[in-house]
Amino acid sequence: MSYGLLRPLLFTLDPERAHTLSIAALEALGHMPRGLARVARRYTAHDPRLAQDFWGLHFANPVGLAAGYDKDARATAALPALGFGFIEIGTVTPRPQPGNPRPRVFRYPAQQAVINRMGFPGEGAAAVARRLAALPGHPVPIGINLGKNKDTPLERAQDDYVAALELLFHYGDYLCINVSSPNTPGLRLLQGEEALRGLLKAVAAANQRLALQHQRPPLPLLLKIAPDLDNDDLNAIGSLALGTAPLVNGFIATNTTIERPASQPGLSESGGLSGAPLLQQSNAVIAQLYRATQGQVPIIGVGGILSAADAYAKILAGASLVQVYSGLIFRGPGLVREILEELPGLWLKDGYPDLAHARGSTA
């Protein structure tokens, strides 16, 4: 059944109920090799022009799944069959927590937007570690998005990130430090330069310690930032990835926004806004980060991608890779293959020989 036929049925359900059903279906599919192969044939696009390498990892294509969908690594075995070049699970907190009261997810089909105030619900890092340990391998890179528990005081936030890192160190290909969700009280205060530098120093030290202890390279550390920062903040954050001893190896830009477009007054629920209204705001942050880092630091662009043109706009702004989530709600899983099949034509039409030459050209 095509997603166009299925979507009206899914949209009669509570958004969180629809999400739970999709996770359950993919979790079951992960145990069905023949089913996975059929799904992969339908949704996977193979094109060597899309392949890139960052942080010592190979990305067969630049389109990943953003954190927020597979919070507890239940669907991780099946998700590569949908054509993603990489998967980011989480957000994972060190201890289980229920998140914020329901309802906490709201669809706006006319605006192709979602507002959520989830608050990092999840089973905790130990449960996620057990599931990831059971995977037979990583056909695509797997990132793990880390957050702090709601009841952990801000002054002890670094303890939560380090605790989660210690539990998950062996099971991800990169780690993302999430200090930008608007749905955990005070979390965005950790984006302040002094607090952020202290947090990242603690996480980087733990990463190096674990690498030495287990005689393996440290994990690439990425930082996920909000779209609501000004250019001075972005310049300061960009500096954390520069120099001889960078505290982070890349950025994910951006999380959801707390701002509401004046042109769309119907987006009234509190929480983080994602989807189409976030596209331009996210792109502006990507471009500023690209300039602040002189294009030397990989950026994963996320926010408002509903087409290949949207993904390409993020690459032009300076993104090396992109992620989708809200776009899948409105366009379905075929969005990934559509982007991958159309991207080369977009950069060739603009006269670029490859993806790397297109990157950052409008920043």
UniProtKB/Swiss-Prot annotation:
Membrane topology of this protein: Peripheral membrane protein
Active site (record annotation): 181
GO cellular component, one term: plasma membrane
MF term (GO), any: dihydroorotate dehydrogenase (quinone) activity
PROSITE patterns associated with the record: DHODEHASE_1, DHODEHASE_2
Subcellular location: Cell membrane
Residue positions binding substrate: 71, 116-120, 178, 183, 255-256
Cofactor note: Binds 1 FMN per subunit.
Pfam families found in the cross-reference section: DHO_dh
Keyword annotations: Cell membrane, Flavoprotein, FMN, Membrane, Oxidoreductase, Pyrimidine biosynthesis
GO annotation (BP), single: 'de novo' UMP biosynthetic process
InterPro entries on file: Aldolase_TIM (IPR013785), DHO_dehydrogenase (IPR050074), Dihydroorotate_DH_2 (IPR005719), Dihydroorotate_DH_cat (IPR005720), Dihydroorotate_DH_CS (IPR001295)
Protein family per UniProt: Belongs to the dihydroorotate dehydrogenase family. Type 2 subfamily.
Self-association state and partner proteins as the record states: Monomer.
Summary of the function given for this chain in its UniProt record: Catalyzes the conversion of dihydroorotate to orotate with quinone as electron acceptor.
Official protein name in the record: Dihydroorotate dehydrogenase (quinone)
Organism: Acidithiobacillus ferrooxidans (strain ATCC 23270 / DSM 14882 / CIP 104768 / NCIMB 8455) (Ferrobacillus ferrooxidans (strain ATCC 23270))
